[in-house]
Amino acid sequence: MADKAQLQEAIKTQGEVVRKLKSEKASKEQIDEEVARLLQLKAQLGGDEGKHVFVLKTAKGTRDYNPKQMAIREKVFNIIINCFKRHGAETIDSPVFELKETLTGKYGEDSKLIYDLKDQGGELLSLRYDLTVPFARYLAMNKITNIKRYHIAKVYRRDNPAMTRGRYREFYQCDFDIAGQYDAMIPDAECLKLVYEILSELDLGDFRIKVNDRRILDGMFAICGVPDEKFRTICSTVDKLDKLAWEEVKKEMVNEKGLSEEVADRIRDYVSMQGGKDLAERLLQDPKLSQSKQACAGITDMKLLFSYLELFQITDKVVFDLSLARGLDYYTGVIYEAILTQANPAPASTPAEQNGAEDAGVSVGSVAGGGRYDGLVGMFDPKGRKVPCVGVSIGIERVFSIMEQKAELSSEKVRTTETQVLVASAQKNLLEERLKLTAELWNAGIKAEVLYKKNPKLLSQLQHCEDTGIPLVAILGEQELKDGVVKLRNVASREEVDVPRAELVDEVKKRTS
């Protein structure tokens, strides 16, 4: 907009948009996005007047996290990592970018979302899209044939983000995978048990875990009349059933993917089926599906899986759902996805960036997904040697969003530090004594703070504890120094007791353990 009057009118209109959003108490992300647009318009106007206005904002699809949000994230990570470790997993790390050829051809229709980097001297590079393909590359490169690993790191997708719906271009994934040649369905059952434990401990609300098998899907497509070359693309369309009505999915199959209406209707008859071990038994008797060796192998494994899930006592949360497809190309066997049926509290909008999960219309949304990918490592091995793998990815951004909303609704204050005690003084000229005592506490492993003023008022020191949630104050005064004691104050109850200086460390540890 070169015309100054037009630019001023656009600024006025955009200002009204921002004010309206604020009055409607819209989400912070939505307001920030519109404010950024307003600032960009103002920057253009400033440029017309010979000034350069630098717009301070994060890149599209990214965000900053304040101390309160990070405290919540740390709590969530700790719960998840403890579950991973309880199951005997060890952790690895890998580069944030890979050779482009490492990632190409592994994600089906989602490959267009891979972030390519500008050529920096010969190697074509891309930012990692998930943690699974780099893990497979790591196994092949290091000739590892069995490992149980977890990996928590950021991944990148060149999505067109609508941050009001919690979609980002940079987000965390939390992956757990078991690699190795083992007896059928035992590692797969453990992955489902792990998901059950994590979601139960996070207390996000009611959930269910949907399971299916790629072999059953492929067998189903074959007997329904889907051409072999269209299996993967139809799989991606079926994967949208958690977000779209059947009519919309059918329309895509017929109009965009070229299936006949008759074939689409046959698919519908199967994808509407749900159950448990009983459904697996029924499908083995299905006159058409039982003709597919591939489907029968998947159904037989599904029966075995449910027998192990019964031993783990989690079948009340697991449903065999033939509509579950998961669009990623590398799955070869069992696939699963955990969805929240009722969040606690139900979020208005929640992030969905995890291994293939997106906003779901029929439930609060997917919070975990995964499956078996026995052929992926072989794609990287020069001799094509396969390492069977099964794993799960926790949709951590969605979890963070729900936990943040729970914190907003809770009366309990979120602490952003772990300070156990503040070293304070009741009189002036005691800075040296405060610093000496603080050093003693630090040396003993106590988390302690001291205010950076020579002569702070006692009231302001106590107020700092109230504001930040520090539970104890160690108060020094001239009399306390003479008597060799420290006055230890409980901030919540305001009770004070004189503690001999030599016993202070033990007393603080006892009270804060």
UniProtKB/Swiss-Prot annotation:
GO biological process: histidyl-tRNA aminoacylation; mitochondrial translation; regulation of vasculature development; sprouting angiogenesis
Domain WHEP-TRS: 3-59
One Pfam family of this chain: HGTP_anticodon
Reactions catalysed: tRNA(His) + L-histidine + ATP = L-histidyl-tRNA(His) + AMP + diphosphate + H(+)
Gene3D superfamilies per record: Anticodon-binding domain (3.40.50.800), Bira Bifunctional Protein, Domain 2 (3.30.930.10), S15/NS1, RNA-binding (1.10.287.10)
Binding sites annotated in the UniProt record for L-histidine: 130-132, 157, 173, 177, 326, 330-331
Database matches in SUPFAM superfamilies: Class II aaRS ABD-related, Class II aaRS and biotin synthetases, S15/NS1 RNA-binding domain
EC number annotated for this UniProt entry: 6.1.1.21
Keywords: Aminoacyl-tRNA synthetase, ATP-binding, Cytoplasm, Ligase, Mitochondrion, Nucleotide-binding, Protein biosynthesis
PROSITE patterns: AA_TRNA_LIGASE_II, WHEP_TRS_1, WHEP_TRS_2
Gene Ontology terms for molecular function: ATP binding; histidine-tRNA ligase activity; identical protein binding; RNA binding
SMART domains per the UniProt record, alphabetical: WHEP-TRS
Job description of the protein: Catalyzes the aminoacylation of histidyl-tRNA.
UniProt family annotation: Belongs to the class-II aminoacyl-tRNA synthetase family.
Database matches in PANTHER family: HISTIDINE--TRNA LIGASE, HISTIDYL-TRNA SYNTHETASE
General remark: Danio rerio genome encodes a single hars gene which undergoes alternative splicing to produce both a cytoplasmic and mitochondrial enzyme, while humans have two separate genes.
HAMAP family: His_tRNA_synth
Protein name as catalogued: Histidine--tRNA ligase
Annotated source species: Danio rerio (Zebrafish)
Gene name, Swiss-Prot/TrEMBL: hars
